[in-house]
Amino acid sequence: MPADFVGLSYEVQQLANPDFFSLKNSGLIRQFRDLAPLGVLRLGGNTSEFATWKQSANAPDPERPNTREVAGEPRAQYYAVTPEAVRNLAGFLHATGWRCIYGIGMGTNTPQRAAAEAEFAAHTLGASLEYFQLGNEVDLFGRHLRDPQTWNAQTYLDEWLAMARAITARVPAARFGMPDVASNIEWLTEIANRWASIPNPPRVVTLTHHYYFGGPATNPAVNIPNLLKPETMAKVQKTADTANTDAKKMGVRVRMTEGNTCYRGGKPGLSDVFAAALWAADYSLLLASNNYTGVNLHGGTGNSVANSVGGSLPGDALLKEQGETPQQIASHPHPFYTPIATFGSEYLLEPVGYGLKFAGALSGSTFVAEDLTAKLQAAGVNATAYAVKLAGGHRSVVVVNKDATKDVDVTLDFGPKTTGAAAVQTLRAPALESREAHIATGPAAHVHNGKVTVTIPHASAMRVTLA
């Protein structure tokens, strides 16, 4: 599990306000640093396809291609990304200790403009640049940005190669992640199968995909029981197996670069409550145990995410139908799934962010084989377990008890020579539906004959660590 496994994903449109990712935004800097000392900020999202690189104030606007307006997809609202925004981003990254996956649109862009932006970004961000991402959810371009009759993984790859080669010509050390699909993992397979036949390909270091449990907010099947049931993570495991097989063919690893509980901005009562914290902890650790380089949970400001999905959040309409007043609606985080919420000038870590933080505490560790998850689920408890060896040599086990009613007693065997006490950390809230989450240190657990017995209450997670 890399030391910078923890990640957040934001819309590129956040750069339209150069002060957002800047040294001026001390509140957001504090939240990033508190979430993880090392991490990866990914800039992308649907709005990246309508960003225009504006090298200077008097640079003319480029010609705009025709696009289609489709429900759930962004309107063609163009905006500028400026050198000031990128310079400020560099300061923000330096202050947080994080690195950046820098997204450049493909949908309405040209290789020449992309190369100019990439050259400036690479020079300005320096060591803070993780790699470039070209295009966002390219498997959905046929809906509004390309001819659905001809758009597929092969035509995408042809366009991607032209853009990536233009960038590499100006940034010889450029690295890339691809293809950043929304859900069609088969595209990874098609790309991996073709990759060996591509002469002198650009340097790809990561295969990337997105993941949302379901959506939109109006879908009744998007609920807490379905979010937390074992079958949900079984599907995640299947995707990870496919992605890892494809990555191995290309000699790279995999990253989940954008995802969360419910697409199109999240669902109130699901995305902004403690159930999302348990989901985030379990989801992150499952992918970490599958050799992923990281997880980037999507969020940001309500306006940027609303713009990315057509101008409004379905969750707001749902709350209005349920009778909430404008003041009550405003009390929810916007978007509902954001790990770090914006309330006026304040930034608050939301439950889903606490889940990511809890899992991220294991960053830098090595996973070890264990069969505790199978034993727990065979006993009829909806729980998962992950065992690691920390960077300093300590051993740690995390149990995520997603069961709504059953507490679980677990005996952890660390070997007969182990003595002393084990440190305990918990992730808890009053209920799955609570709009809060807490990470706390519990009483030390006694080690007897190398074994530690602990009780993990229902709807909570626990980490037990031995020196």
Report the location of each language-model feature.
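Noncatalytic carbohydrate-binding groove/subsite architecture in carbohydrate-active enzymes
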Residues: 102, 111-113, 117-119, 152-283, ...
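Conserved, mostly hydrophobic/aromatic
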Residues: 8, 41, 132, 137, ...
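Aromatic/acidic polysaccharide-binding cleft in carbohydrate-active enzymes
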Residues: 256, 261-384
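Acidic, Ser/Thr/Pro-rich beta/coil linker or hinge segments at domain junctions
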Residues: 416-460
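Short, solvent-exposed beta-strand-terminating loops
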Residues: 38-60, 211-217, 297, 302-306, ...
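N-terminal catalytic cores of secreted or lumenal carbohydrate-active enzymes
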Residues: 1-194
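Short, solvent-exposed loop/turn elements at domain surfaces
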Residues: 14-19, 50-52, 217-218, 431-436, ...
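Carbohydrate-binding surface patches
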Residues: 378-418, 424-427, 459-462
